[in-house]
Swiss-Prot record:
Domain of life: Eukaryota
Residues that bear Phosphotyrosine: Y23
Positions of post-translational N-acetylthreonine modification: T2
Entries under Gene3D superfamilies matching the protein: Coagulation Factor XIII, subunit A, domain 1
Keywords: Acetylation, Cytoplasm, GTPase activation, Phosphoprotein
Bias type Basic and acidic residues, positions: 30-40
Cystine bridges: none
Organism: Bos taurus (Bovine)
Modified residues (N6-acetyllysine): K20, K24, K39, K46, K101, K123, K174
Protein name: Rho GDP-dissociation inhibitor 2
Pfam families linked to this entry: Rho_GDI
Region (Disordered): 1-40
Length: 200
């Protein structure tokens, strides 16, 4: 079997797809408006209580609605945690390189908080480049979440790191945490090196 380098491919932009599907997200409502709606519908009241909790959410008015705190590459065979702090200096993060051994199975875990209002259609998008050429684009639907003091955690399905001599090397990733309303909650860049071994 011959080894092949990752090939660049073109995917339709999410905005173009939304246009073709004629999808329009529902208008944004404040948390207070949502809590006041359909008060006499018992099943909806229970659902909202499950989503929002019992009491009023006290939020810092200066905080963004969504705060992405960290990204972790979850890999059982890794010698230690592979975690990036997304609350600090994102420019410094661009200069760091994280290592994955070729062919290992891993998942991406994202920790985030919703601070004020319900957010609909959260998604994690990752563009991957090698020597300046886009070689992959992945979009993961994260879902809709209500505000709460605790962090939420999202795990992608299991993926396999590229393998083979031609696949080894450094990949530059541009990651986006966005939603149906096209709010850019966080955009960051980071590097991933695929190596023959963890300690190579």
């Amino acid at each position: 079997m011959t080894e092949k380098a990752p090939e660049p491919h073109v995917e339709e932009d999410d905005d173009e797809l939304d246009g073709k599907l004629n999808y329009k997200p529902p208008p944004q409502k404040s948390l207070k408006e949502l809590q006041e709606m359909d008060k006499d519908d018992e099943s909806l009241t229970k659902y909202k209580k499950t989503l929002l909790g019992d009491g009023p959410v006290v939020a810092d008015p200066t905080a963004p609605n969504v705060t992405v705190t960290r990204l972790t590459l979850v890999c059982e065979s890794a010698p230690g945690p592979i975690t990036m702090d997304l609350t600090g200096d994102l420019e410094a993060l661009k200069k760091e390189t994280f290592v994955l051994k070729e062919g290992v199975e891993y998942r991406v875990k994202i920790n985030f908080k919703v601070n004020k209002d319900i957010v609909s259609g959260l998604k994690y998008v990752q563009h991957t480049y090698r020597t300046g050429v886009k070689v992959d684009k992945a979009t993961f639907m994260v879902g809709s979440y209500g505000p709460r003091p605790e962090e939420y955690e999202f795990l992608t399905p299991i993926e396999e790191a590229p393998k083979g001599m031609l696949a080894r090397g450094t990949y530059h990733n541009k990651s986006f945490f966005t939603d149906d309303d096209k709010h850019d909650h966080l955009t960051w860049e980071w590097n991933l090196s695929i190596k023959k071994d963890w300690t190579e």
